[in-house]
Amino acid sequence: MIQSQINRNIRLDLADAILLSKAKKDLSFAEIADGTGLAEAFVTAALLGQQALPADAARLVGAKLDLDEDSILLLQMIPLRGCIDDRIPTDPTMYRFYEMLQVYGTTLKALVHEKFGDGIISAINFKLDVKKVADPEGGERAVITLDGKYLPTKPF
């Protein structure tokens, strides 16, 4: 039976335990996701408490991380999503995403509406990918793809 969570703390505690196990075992998120049939970004989001894993994937991930049965069950429960503190992020990486939306949020909104009409980009029917590519000017660049289904606003 599908279960739901109403408290974010239990999943945040599980995420801390998962990250500790991941570090002890020297596993990457890609290695943990391997064999689940799910995208690395989706499995990572589940491990960090923002998505629910199907039972088979939760068991596979649980075995790789030596999680107990309760933790494997928690990974399958629908989490309280978007439960990051309601304040400006202080972590430098997360702050840069916040900053990007502060600078480009209105641009993204204007372009989405111009190209699609009044509506939103779904975060439910959504895919995320992060790639590291060489920068022709030296160093490396991050290519982040946000791929969400467009959902038009419908008058009623």
UniProtKB/Swiss-Prot annotation:
Per UniProt, which keywords does this protein have?
Lyase
Which residues are named in the active-site annotation?
Answer: R96, E99, S122
Q: What class of enzyme is it?
A: lyase
The organism's superkingdom is given as Bacteria
One GO biological-process annotation of the entry reads: cyanate catabolic process
GO MF, any single term: cyanate hydratase activity
Question: Assembly and interactions?
Answer: Homodecamer composed of five homodimers.
Record protein name field: Cyanate hydratase
Tell me the Gene3D superfamilies matching this sequence.
Cyanate lyase, C-terminal domain, lambda repressor-like DNA-binding domains
- From the UniProt record, list the reaction(s) this protein catalyses: cyanate + hydrogencarbonate + 3 H(+) = NH4(+) + 2 CO2
Per its UniProt record, what HAMAP family does this chain match? Cyanate_hydrat
Annotated EC: 4.2.1.104
The family classification in the record reads: Belongs to the cyanase family.
SUPFAM superfamilies according to UniProt: Cyanase C-terminal domain, lambda repressor-like DNA-binding domains
State the organism named in the record: Escherichia coli (strain K12)
What's this protein's function? Catalyzes the reaction of cyanate with bicarbonate to produce ammonia and carbon dioxide.
What CDD domains does the entry give?
Answer: Cyanase_C
